[in-house]
């Protein structure tokens, strides 16, 4: 079951395809291709205690600098620079998703408005009286907040979900006490 879960993106700066691939254990690699048929492995990466389902995508930070995010199945990620030949992590491993209800997230590329949209699998929650035990998450928009090595990934439900709202409940600043 190793060596799977390819994620392929286009890198316009070098006019080549880039593939993030899970190898085994906590090991991944990056490959490139100009024709999407013949691939060359050019970098190995690891995310400690993370396996499967890599993702690799660009986002701009608060300073406007293009950064690349390397993401593993458990929502652990690295932010760094990528020149088409080398991914250079500029942060330690960061955590964006915790718990069993977010796994194997993937982004959608080339959205018409340039947003980075992500969905993940939800598996592990108990849903009383439901005829299923897994589902997809709602789509979220990803952005980077901060710059340099002080940057984090932020997820927010996509704006299209606002059209589904039917009513709003507002709660005042009441204190919540145990047993109330």
Question: Each predicted region: which residue ranges?
Answer:
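Hydrophobic core segments of beta-strands in well-ordered, beta-rich domains
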Residues: 1-31, 41-46, 53-57, 64-74, ...
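A structural signal for short hydrophobic beta-strand segments in well-ordered beta-sheet cores
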Residues: 8, 56, 80, 107, ...
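Blade-edge beta-strand/turn elements of extracellular beta-propeller
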Residues: 1, 29-48, 79-98, 150-156
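Repeated scaffold domains used in trafficking and secretory/extracellular systems
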Residues: 51-56, 102-105
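Structured loop/turn residues at beta-strand edges in well-structured enzyme cores
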Residues: 15, 34-37, 137
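Beta-rich accessory regions
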Residues: 63, 83-100, 108-180
């Amino acid at each position: 079951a190793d060596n799977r879960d390819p994620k392929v993106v286009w890198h316009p700066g070098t006019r080549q395809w880039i593939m993030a691939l899970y190898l085994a254990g906590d090991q991944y690699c990056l490959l490139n291709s100009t024709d999407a048929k013949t691939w060359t492995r050019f970098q190995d990466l690891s995310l400690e205690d993370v396996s499967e389902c890599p993702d690799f995508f660009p986002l701009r930070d608060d300073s406007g600098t293009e950064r690349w995010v390397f993401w593993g199945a458990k929502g652990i990620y690295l932010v760094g620079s990528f020149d088409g030949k080398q991914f250079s992590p500029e942060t330690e491993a960061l955590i964006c998703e915790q718990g069993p209800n977010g796994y194997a997230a993937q982004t959608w590329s080339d959205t018409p408005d340039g947003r980075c949209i992500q969905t993940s699998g939800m598996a592990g929650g108990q849903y009383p009286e439901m005829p299923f035990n897994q589902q997809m998450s709602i789509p979220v928009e990803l952005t980077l907040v901060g710059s340099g090595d002080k940057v984090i990934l932020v997820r927010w439900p996509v704006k299209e979900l606002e059209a589904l709202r039917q009513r709003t409940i507002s709660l005042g600043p009441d204190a919540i006490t145990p047993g109330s």
